[in-house]
Curated annotation (Swiss-Prot):
Protein function: May act as an apoptosis inhibitor.
CDD domains: BIR
Residue span of region Disordered: 83-126
PROSITE patterns assigned to the protein according to its UniProt record, in alphabetical order: BIR_REPEAT_1, BIR_REPEAT_2, ZF_RING_2
Annotated organism of origin: Ostreid herpesvirus 1 (isolate France) (OsHV-1)
Sample GO molecular function, one term: zinc ion binding
Classification via PANTHER family: INHIBITOR OF APOPTOSIS
Protein name, per record: Putative apoptosis inhibitor ORF42
BIR repeats: 24-89, 127-193, 236-300
Zinc finger (RING-type): 315-350
């Protein structure tokens, strides 16, 4: 169970769940920037992960800090009185006493201040026998559903008590559901908490199974596509159906010679085996291919003027030769190759020159 699941639960239930070490540890699931040992230490010392990127919070005093601030965390563990006092406890503290509500309407917890007991049922007698011949609502609330919630009939009237948390409910109505009333009135009951944990674990397992099935189907489909000859346009298009890149015109990408091999957003050209990664929405696959791998046979028919680089402009430095060199990464096209080798920064934007591509098909 992670933060996303806790967001949909009542706050009283969230507070109760966070008293459990395994629940706090589960809030760190999916956070990749801390070791498992550090996550275990944080959960053991009563911290849990909150929604902010690197933020954790103390379950007792609610102090927030960065998961990376090791010095402050360890100082807080030593200083937080609630954490020090409560650290030896294995179970959350008993729920506070509750006041009896008005007679009638929803079931109400009795005004009791009885500490929670352990998980093992404390009573040896058959709880079902306490209802037989006494439960006044058997026509619309079955005895079995009450027993399943840990209730025993204590009377008078329709009063029942949970064997685990000792909450007492009464004034049942025809539309009441025992499990819902139990969760609403006693969210910290071990039986209720265990049901939440089981439900979340089952949801996680179901999602994991579904994700693995999707990944397996995707892998099988991609392997089928990769087994084909990528010189064929239709096979490249088939592989690009799985590509997570931002360019939606996959046919244009395929016609440029690229196909997808399943690694991040990297594309590979079938003709020159070049690989390009970190694609952006406005990238032109033909232009990127021509600039980065101008010698590719698949780019032989693509002219530099077709991708926005014309040699009609003069070099801005010597003012004699024609501009014929693309500067990377800024892609400005204002220098002849000779002048470009004499400068370290682009004269237009002042960015450092990392690579020079001469449009007369001399790759530098």
């Amino acid at each position: 169970m992670g933060i996303s699941e806790l967001e949909y639960l009542p706050q009283t239930t969230v507070n109760a769940l966070l008293q459990y070490d395994n629940v706090r540890l589960a809030t760190f699931r999916g956070y990749e920037y801390a070791t498992d040992q550090w996550k275990k230490y944080l959960s053991d010392t009563k911290f849990f992960k909150v929604g902010e990127v690197d933020q954790i919070q103390c379950v007792f005093c609610r102090m927030k800090t960065s998961i990376r601030n090791e010095e402050r965390i360890k100082k807080h563990v030593a200083d937080c009185r609630e954490g020090v006092v409560s650290a030896p406890q294995q179970q959350p503290p008993p729920p506070p006493s509750t006041s009896i509500g008005a007679v009638g309407g929803d079931p109400r917890p009795e005004d009791m201040n009885v500490p929670e007991r352990g998980w093992d049922p404390p009573m040896s007698k058959d709880p079902k026998s306490t209802f037989l011949g006494k439960w006044p609502h058997s026509e619309y609330i079955s005895i079995d559903s009450m027993v399943a919630e840990g209730f025993e009939f204590i009377g008078p009237g329709d009063r029942v008590q949970c064997r685990h948390c000792k909450v007492i409910l009464r004034n049942w109505e025809t539309t009441d559901i025992p499990s819902s009333e139990h969760e609403r009135n006693a969210p910290r009951c071990p039986l209720v908490v265990q049901r939440y944990l089981t439900r979340m674990r089952e949801d996680d397992e179901r999602r994991d199974r579904e994700l693995k099935e999707v990944q397996q189907r995707r892998k099988m489909d991609m392997n089928k596509a990769f087994s084909q000859d990528m010189s064929k346009l239709e096979n490249r298009i088939a592989s690009l159906k799985f590509w997570p890149g931002p360019i939606r015109d996959i046919e244009k990408v395929a016609r440029t010679g690229f196909f997808y091999t399943g690694e991040k957003d990297m594309l590979t050209c079938y003709a020159c085996a070049c690989k390009l990664i970190n694609w952006e929405k406005n990238d032109d696959p033909i232009k990127e291919h021509k600039i980065n791998f101008p010698h590719c046979a698949n780019m032989a028919d693509v002219k530099w003027s077709d991708v926005g680089f014309s040699n009609d402009e003069e070099c801005v430095i010597c003012l004699g030769a024609k501009a014929d060199t693309i500067l990377k990464p800024c892609l400005h096209y204002s220098l002849c190759y000779g002048c470009s080798t004499q400068v370290q920064k682009c004269p237009l934007c002042r960015k450092k020159i990392e690579k020079r591509v001469q449009t007369t098909n001399v790759l530098q």
